[in-house]
Amino acid sequence: MDFLTDWLTNWLKELLIGGIMGNLEGLFDTVNTQVGEIAAQVGTTPAAWHAGVFSLIRQLSETVILPIAGMVLTFVATYELIQMLLEKNNMHEVDIANLYKWMFKTACAILILSNTFNIVMAVFDVSQSVIAQAGGLIQGSTDVSADMLAELETSLEAMDLGPLLGLWLQSALIGFTMKAMGIIIFVLVYGRMLEIYLLTSLAPIPVATLSNRELGSTGQNYIKSLFAVGFQGLLILVCVAIYAVLIQGIATSGDPIGAIWGTVGYTVLLCFMLFKTGSIAQRIFGAH
């Protein structure tokens, strides 16, 4: 009878240990996979992310928004000319050099406005290049080796049946948590790209105000917002990379229960910080 009880207990322990290790191996595999996917997604330029959407946004910007921006620039240039003429004793003293300066300034503003889309894409090309380089470095440092999981399995074998059952239930719960985190990451990464497209579609209007001293703050803040959204991808990548490195420490801690709940805590922390990346990027670049 004792032999049968021992056999059944050992069989259940092996079953639970196998289930726990399966959950944890899948959990750590998910971490590595998500790091790679995020590196690929946030490192993709708007043109390469979705060709159809990119073409639509470009047509909208160049055919609908650009003419409106041209009217804004006309108003800005005319307003500056009137101000310049009235500065010198109500047009009694007109400095010809100032007229040449105004013509040169207006010509530069027209040139910039006509190339707005290319300038905006150049901003994102710079940020995506930095993200791609960082993604290559980060991907190489987040692999969870088989030795780490082997140490964890050894500690599981020394546990009794009751704690193993509870640990298996907890590991299953963590699996659902990781899926929820994947959805949150999906929303953030894809939402960021949609934000980039929306910013790009209306780009000519704020750019048209850059040449004016009083209204130029609108265009300057827009440029800052472009850099903030572009480099937000780097902050997202850094957050997930830090998370993956912390998970490595959990895998080698030798405490299965601590590993499970440590993963829960780090997952919640990651989701919180991912939501904060946008505001952090805006503070860094002074956008508001």
Please state what every model-predicted region is:
Residues 1-72:
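Binding/recognition "hotspot" determinant
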Residues 16, 106-202, 236, 240-285:
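Non-cytosolic segments of integral membrane proteins
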Residues 70, 74-86, 236-251:
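Juxtamembrane "helix exit" motif at the C-terminal ends of alpha-helical transmembrane segments
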Residues 48-63, 90-98, 163, 167, ...:
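Membrane-helix interfacial "entry" motifs
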Residues 1, 8, 12-23, 94-112, ...:
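Alpha-helical transmembrane segments and their helix-start/interface "positive-inside/aromatic belt" motifs
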